[in-house]
């Protein structure tokens, strides 16, 4: 950490998933950290407990909130407007302003950098890789976009040589890293509000692969055509290790390294037999879904490449209890009119993610042999909703019943004439469009039956409804 003075850091939007993790590492390293956010939150409270000084609301005077002006100001440019008063104050005082990705890149210097990229599955795969390496005794540093359920944290300053982190492509931040091991889970057009074209989106992954360091390894999912094509493109320039199904491994024999030999879904989870290199292990996944098995393959491949023992990595994967908001179990109704109904919450906000989660929910429902799948979905961003309305409708129709909330605009302004009905009107299952957020739990209760699997889904405020729905269903216990 030589090029940036991190002795006194101020972070705008410090409570965000990515920012709070980096703040944790800075505090562990002895930096004096201050920050601001628009509201109180669990991450803000946790950082205060670690010693950070944090203000709610953005004001110019927040820069000196800890008693001195910062040596550097950190922000997420995608989330923070350029007229933010703290940004303006920093520039007026000639204080360097850097992106969160620049800071993370600085923190990863002198480590073996394990970067997890891809359109979907980054957080789950990164989390599995971390838990696996911990089980293998490697104590990696890490920064994750979600909170590990078991560890209760999203970042750690470890004693091992590996640093595992998500490489976010949404604003091309992944091009600020220097991976020794680069994992690409899948590639599918997204974030077109930033990239404008699919071609520009695909290119950012080519550029990411170009940044793999000499002697490094590119790990790709062979079941995903675009990730597999990336591996094929770079296999003569660096070590490429592919993972996936036996059929995919046969299609790409030159790079196949990790293969799912067998998978069996039961009420207690998913059992998979996985061959990594010349060795085979059995893994029991607590989190359902074929996509989660592929994520486990990515984590095992990265772990072995990082020098860890496969058996110990596999034990860590089998002990993996998930990440907050990734098919996160909120509770079961023990009795009454909705007995044995279960409520889950998931961050899925792209049609492919919705498909994967609902297929996983269906696998779980079929393993139980009873009940239905009910989804309460909140679209995220007007641009994404308009771009993928038909695909969302098809994906959501994998459930048995649905409640569709209005669009969570986040950083975008409303678009006249556009609401979630452009999705719900195309769906082929019973569906209710409910624009009143406070009425959603009641709508779900009207639909619910005993033994149902109910999933709240989306990247916005819908997560607040999981416990509200569970409480409503438990009123009849």
Curated annotation (Swiss-Prot):
Q: Out of the domains of life, which is the source?
A: Bacteria
Say yes or no: keyword ATP-binding present: yes
Q: GO CC: one term?
A: cytoplasm
Q: What is its main location?
A: cytoplasm
Q: Name one GO molecular function term.
A: UDP-N-acetylmuramate-L-alanine ligase activity
Q: Which SUPFAM superfamilies match?
A: MurCD N-terminal domain, MurD-like peptide ligases, catalytic domain, MurD-like peptide ligases, peptide-binding domain
Keyword list, A-Z: ATP-binding, Cell cycle, Cell division, Cell shape, Cell wall biogenesis/degradation, Cytoplasm, Ligase, Nucleotide-binding, Peptidoglycan synthesis
So what does this thing catalyse? UDP-N-acetyl-alpha-D-muramate + L-alanine + ATP = UDP-N-acetyl-alpha-D-muramoyl-L-alanine + ADP + phosphate + H(+)
Q: Which pathway or pathways does this protein act in?
A: Cell wall biogenesis; peptidoglycan biosynthesis
Protein localization = Cytoplasm
Q: Where does ATP bind?
A: 118-124
The Gene Ontology biological process annotation of the record reads: cell division; cell wall organization; peptidoglycan biosynthetic process; regulation of cell shape
Chaperone found in the keyword field = no
Q: What is its EC number?
A: 6.3.2.8
Q: Which family does it belong to?
A: Belongs to the MurCDEF family.
Name the job this protein performs. Cell wall formation.
Q: What is this protein called?
A: UDP-N-acetylmuramate--L-alanine ligase
Query: Which species is this record about?
Result: Corynebacterium diphtheriae (strain ATCC 700971 / NCTC 13129 / Biotype gravis)
Its gene is murC
């Amino acid at each position: 950490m030589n090029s940036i003075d991190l002795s006194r850091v101020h972070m705008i939007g410090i409570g965000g998933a990515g920012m709070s993790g980096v703040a944790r590492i800075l505090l562990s390293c002895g930096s004096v950290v201050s920050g601001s956010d628009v509201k109180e939150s669990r991450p803000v409270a946790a950082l205060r407990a670690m010693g950070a000084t944090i203000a709610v609301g953005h004001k110019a005077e927040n820069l000196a909130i800890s008693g001195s002006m910062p040596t550097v100001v950190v922000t997420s440019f995608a989330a923070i407007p350029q007229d933010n008063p703290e940004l303006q104050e920093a520039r007026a005082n000639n204080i360097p302003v850097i992106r969160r990705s620049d800071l993370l890149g600085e923190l990863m210097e002198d480590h073996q950098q394990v970067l997890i990229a891809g359109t979907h599955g980054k957080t789950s795969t990164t989390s599995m890789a971390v838990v696996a390496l911990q089980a293998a005794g490697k104590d990696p540093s890490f920064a994750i976009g979600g909170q590990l359920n078991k560890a209760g944290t999203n970042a750690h300053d470890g004693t091992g040589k590996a640093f595992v982190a998500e490489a976010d492509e949404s604003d091309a931040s992944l091009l600020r890293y220097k991976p020794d091991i680069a994992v690409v889970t899948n590639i599918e057009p997204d974030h077109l509000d930033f990239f404008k074209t699919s071609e520009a989106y695909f290119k950012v992954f080519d550029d990411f692969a170009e940044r793999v360091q000499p002697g490094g390894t590119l790990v790709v999912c062979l079941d995903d055509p675009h990730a597999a094509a990336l591996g094929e493109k770079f296999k003569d320039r660096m070590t490429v290790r592919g993972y996936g199904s036996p059929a995919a491994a046969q299609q790409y024999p030159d790079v196949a390294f990790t293969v799912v030999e067998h998978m069996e879904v039961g009420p207690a989870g998913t059992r998979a037999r996985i061959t990594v290199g010349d060795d085979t292990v059995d893994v029991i996944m607590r989190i359902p879904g074929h996509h989660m098995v592929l994520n486990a393959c990515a984590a095992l491949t990265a772990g072995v490449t990082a020098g860890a023992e496969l058996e110990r990595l596999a034990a860590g994967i089998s002990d993996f209890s998930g990440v907050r908001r990734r098919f996160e179990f909120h509770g079961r109704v023990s009795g009454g009119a909705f007995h044995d109904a279960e409520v889950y919450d998931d961050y899925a906000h792209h049609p492919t993610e919705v498909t994967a989660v609902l297929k996983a929910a269906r696998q779980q429902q079929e393993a139980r042999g009873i009940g239905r799948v009910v989804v309460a979905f909140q679209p995220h961003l007007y641009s994404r909703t308009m771009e993928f309305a038909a695909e969302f409708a098809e994906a959501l129709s994998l459930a048995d019943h649905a409640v569709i909330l209005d669009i969570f605009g986040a950083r975008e302004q409303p678009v006249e004439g556009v609401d979630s009905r452009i999705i719900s009107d195309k769906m082929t299952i019973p569906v209710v469009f409910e624009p009143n957020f406070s009425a959603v739990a009641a709508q779900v209760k009207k639909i619910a039956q005993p033994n149902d699997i109910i999933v709240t889904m989306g990247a916005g405020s819908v997560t607040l409804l999981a416990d509200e729905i569970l409480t409503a269903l438990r009123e009849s216990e």
